[in-house]
Amino acid sequence: MALSTAEKKQILAEYGLHDSDTGSAEAQVALLTKRIIGLTEHLKQHKHDHHSRRGLLLMVGRRRRLLNYLTKVDIERYRSLIQRLGLRR
């Protein structure tokens, strides 16, 4: 699922470190999470769409690597992010 420009701006405003932040780990994880949620909903209806499933697995892996990086750099930023995104239950 592609995100519209307005959706991206809203997510970046909420999770970015400053106004024009698009590259911080928090911003990237938030954008990936939104795309993962959309693709998960798509796959619930289209169970045999294996091409999209592979894309989903790649996105989940990329998000996992970014979260691992964030734990090494700043554990408090990591904890804040997963709590705001609701990733761990």
From Swiss-Prot:
| Cellular component per GO, a single term | cytosolic small ribosomal subunit
Family annotation (PROSITE patterns): RIBOSOMAL_S15 (PS00362)
Keyword hit for Aminoacyl-tRNA synthetase: no
Q: Which family does it belong to?
A: Belongs to the universal ribosomal protein uS15 family.
Q: Which PANTHER family match?
A: RIBOSOMAL PROTEIN S15, BACTERIAL AND ORGANELLAR, SMALL RIBOSOMAL SUBUNIT PROTEIN US15M
Name of this chain's protein: Small ribosomal subunit protein uS15
The record's annotation in SMART domains points to: Ribosomal_S15
Assembly and partners are described as: Part of the 30S ribosomal subunit. Forms a bridge to the 50S subunit in the 70S ribosome, contacting the 23S rRNA.
Checking InterPro entries in the record gives: Ribosomal_uS15, Ribosomal_uS15_bac-type, uS15_NS1_RNA-bd_sf
Q: What's the domain of life for this entry?
A: Bacteria
Task: Name any one GO molecular function.
Answer: rRNA binding
Q: Which GO terms describe its biological process?
A: translation
Q: Relate the protein's function as given in its record.
A: One of the primary rRNA binding proteins, it binds directly to 16S rRNA where it helps nucleate assembly of the platform of the 30S subunit by binding and bridging several RNA helices of the 16S rRNA. Forms an intersubunit bridge (bridge B4) with the 23S rRNA of the 50S subunit in the ribosome.
Q: Which UniProt keywords apply?
A: Ribonucleoprotein, Ribosomal protein, RNA-binding, rRNA-binding
